[in-house]
Amino acid sequence: MGLQEHPVTPAERQPPVRGGVTIGVEEEFLLVDAASGQLAPHAEAVLAEAANGPLGAPDAVLHAEMLNSQVEAATGCCRTLEELRSQLVAARTSLDRAASVAGARIVSSGTPVLAVEGTGTSNGQRFADIAERYRAVASDYHVCGCHVHVGVPDRDTAVAVVNHLRPWLPTLLAISANSPFHLGHDTGHASWRGVQQRLYPGSGVPPHFPSRDAYDREVARLVDCGALVDDRMSFWMARPSPHLPTVELRVADALITAEETVLQAALSRALVRAALDDLAAGREGDEVSDQVAAAAVWNASRYGLRGPAVDPVPARRVPALEMVERLLRRVGPALEQTGDSALVREALAHVTGVGTGSERQRAAAAAGGPREVVAMLAAATAPGRADRLRT
């Protein structure tokens, strides 16, 4: 959700590097009752239980999110995708083990499948301030995302890199789309989280900023205007970390499997590396109007990968899968540099073949109704826990 009370996480605690090497991921999860599949307000109990057991990823951190039916896992600073995957799996397994003690399961979905009842805000003054400022927007914001941090040399570079990322953020959202349901109903959208996020000020594709100072002034202005609670809170899909020299991509829905999260991280890192190469060569990022960028996000939220997309640079509609191919061409050299090309192409072929998370959720609903969706999500979220929800 991006509204954390916690201090800087290991995913953000990355040393200055040449850039585009280190990665870290924050994954948000919903807690559901193991019997009913409804959201379960057990975050405090789950985190306490998880603290008593082996995590299997010493650099990872587990903590609360804004709502008491959510938890988050932040990996440590990783240099390879295999290292990242190992930490993701370990954290998911630890959280699900702890949730089972509380009679719950973790599910990785951008929004809850079933209607929301009996949940509230987690403890903490910042959470209370956010709830008071945004009221129903915050209390109805039962969403989970996946945030990817990529190390860059400094904050000035981070702002410049984000300018180069702007045209590609909607495609990352389409690939990650995993939130078709809201309050027990099919929204008709691939990413309802993407729709709900736009209710907050300072969301969507960030504007182009000519400098770090310009970025900082704009954030300060939004805080002064009351749109943001503080300077850590912007909802833009990509931003410089408020704390350290990283670019944080906050575009993706929470992804069902660890493998899909690794794919999102790999594409994010490759886009940052491509941007760094452009900056080193003196190439400017493509110009994209804010309104066209918003249209591209809307199309990605609505259709995912099975319909039209908007190519923001010529500002025209194209098939969503065509944008995926263009993305692959954009990041191809960067993926070759890190040795990740084959993995990414295979993972993308799998997603386009079996469907995004939203498509798989709808297929499960067609086969067995909403509880079948929750069962599918619970089984796939935590590897090794293939048992279904209790009946």
From Swiss-Prot:
InterPro entries, A to Z: GCL_type2/YbdK_subfam (IPR050141), GCS2 (IPR006336), Gln_synth/guanido_kin_cat_dom (IPR014746), YbdK (IPR011793)
Protein family according to the UniProt entry: Belongs to the glutamate--cysteine ligase type 2 family. YbdK subfamily.
Alphabetical keyword list: ATP-binding, Ligase, Nucleotide-binding
Record's protein name: Putative glutamate--cysteine ligase 2-2
Record's catalysed reaction(s): L-cysteine + L-glutamate + ATP = gamma-L-glutamyl-L-cysteine + ADP + phosphate + H(+)
Enzyme nomenclature, EC number: 6.3.2.2
Highest taxon of the lineage: Bacteria
One GO BP annotation of this record: modified amino acid biosynthetic process
GO molecular function, one term: glutamate-cysteine ligase activity
PANTHER family found in the cross-reference section: GLUTAMATE--CYSTEINE LIGASE 2-RELATED
Enzyme class (EC, first level): ligase
Function, in words: ATP-dependent carboxylate-amine ligase which exhibits weak glutamate--cysteine ligase activity.
Pfam families referenced in this protein's UniProt entry, alphabetically: GCS2 (PF04107)
